[in-house]
Regions:
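A conserved short coil-to-beta-strand element within the FAD-binding core of flavoproteins
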Residues: 253-266
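N-terminal export signals
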Residues: 1-2, 7-24
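Flavin (FAD/FMN) cofactor-binding and adjacent substrate-gating region
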Residues: 2, 49-68, 140-142, 172-249
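Short beta-strand to alpha-helix junction loop
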Residues: 80-84, 162-168, 227-242, 338-339
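Active-site substrate-recognition segment that forms the wall
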Residues: 24-67, 76-84, 90, 111-123, ...
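Beta1/beta-strand and adjacent pyrophosphate-binding region of the FAD-binding site
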Residues: 102-110
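Short hydrophobic core segments
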Residues: 271-277
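Glycine-rich active-site loop/strand segments that organize a redox cofactor
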Residues: 134-169, 216-217
Length: 362
């Protein structure tokens, strides 16, 4: 995994589904106020569920010969697809483009397909995206959008070489998203509060600026261990719409097409093909290690005064201009993308209990 925030979630969502774990022992201590989220079932404007494409041994960036074509894979990013998109796609294009001449095909129009297509265009090549689904009907649209890798590998299943690949992808994505901050792409910086199982800095502290352990006087939460840092958050529907517009504006094409077998790719005119099919790579290319991990979200009406994110045993809350996201499930091997009302109710209830337990409010 990566950070404690969703370590609570990845542990099985038991804490979330049983309600907020607060003790009440800190209520008489000094307190720094924040505005609480107004968590009321009547404020839920939509519920969604998406499938994270999870591989225990980590995401795949690999070039394979494919008849008279070259096939470059770029998939399997678990819950870190938005976060790692630019870096992983850069690795993929660095594998595919050198020595290539002519147009390029990208399979898939989620965040990996769109960022791969943009990098292909930036390198001077014409590109066509072939996809079975367009935004907003892609898994990427459901993503919460915190720039922080989560749920995309198992510590005991990855190699040192893969860890180096991950670090390089994270570094490039981190720098690229900073250049995109602002309204156009829906990227903004926010302070993030986490209930933490540890109080020492992580190995990835460089991607968590201003990280520090807080005393009870520094926050309003009825929690024992809290850390705070800053990171970027992506309003994914806006981000994906703008990337799509960028691809089309630079002369790219997007065609609706479904591929049932790898042999179907042989009919494409392009000699270089990037596979950015996410969870679809399991069936299309027979990757049995790829498994779905379902995440469910309840989205509340926007609340402009909420200018922070928070996460812990109750779940996680990300504020966006299109709504307040409440999440916290990590359901392995569940293929159904229909939100479960009972689970959504528990997500809402756990967040209502958490924000209702603030020791002081702004």
């Amino acid at each position: 995994m990566f950070i404690d925030r969703r370590g609570f979630v990845a542990a099985g969502s038991a804490a979330l589904l049983s309600g907020c774990a607060t003790t009440g022992t800190r209520r008489d201590q000094a307190c720094s106020a924040l505005a609480p989220v107004n968590v009321d079932p009547s404020r839920v404007i939509r519920t969604v569920a998406g499938l994270r494409p999870y591989r225990a041994s980590g995401f795949v960036v690999r070039r394979d010969p494919f008849g008279d074509k070259a096939l470059v894979h770029n998939y399997g990013h678990g819950g870190a697809g938005i976060t790692l998109s630019w870096g992983s796609s850069r690795m993929a294009t660095n594998l595919g483009l050198p020595g290539h001449n002519g147009p390029v095909a990208v399979i898939g129009a989620g965040v990996m397909g769109l960022t791969t297509a943009r990098l292909v265009q930036e390198a001077g090549f014409p590109v066509t995206i072939y996809t079975a689904a367009l935004s907003p009907d892609t898994t990427s649209n459901v993503a919460g959008g915190q720039i922080s890798p989560f749920g995309h590998f198992s510590e005991d299943a990855v190699t040192p070489e893969w860890r180096a690949q991950f670090a390089a992808a994270m570094a490039y994505s981190w720098s690229r998203f900073q250049l995109m901050a602002g309204e156009k792409y829906g990227v903004r910086w926010l302070p993030t509060y986490e209930e933490s199982r540890r109080i020492e800095p992580t190995a990835y502290e460089s991607f968590m600026p201003d990280w520090r352990v807080l005393s009870p006087a520094d926050h309003p939460f009825d929690l024992e261990n809290v850390v705070r840092y800053r990171t970027m958050y992506v309003e994914t529907p806006r981000f994906l719409r703008q990337l799509t517009a960028d691809v089309l504006g630079a002369g790219g094409k997007i065609l609706l097409r479904r591929f049932a077998t790898p042999a179907d790719l042989g009919a494409l005119p392009e000699k270089l093909v990037f596979n950015c099919t996410g969870i679809g790579a399991r069936d299309l290319f027979g990757d049995a290690e790829l498994h779905p991990v379902r995440g469910q979200l309840a989205v509340l009406q926007p609340q402009p005064e909420i200018l922070y994110a928070a996460a812990g045993s109750w779940g996680y809350m990300f504020p966006r201009l299109d709504g307040i996201l409440l999440g916290g499930t990590f359901e392995r091997d569940v293929w159904d993308t229909t939100p479960v009302p009972a689970t959504i109710d528990r997500i809402v209830r756990s967040h209502r209990d958490f924000f209702g337990s603030f020791r002081c409010t702004a």
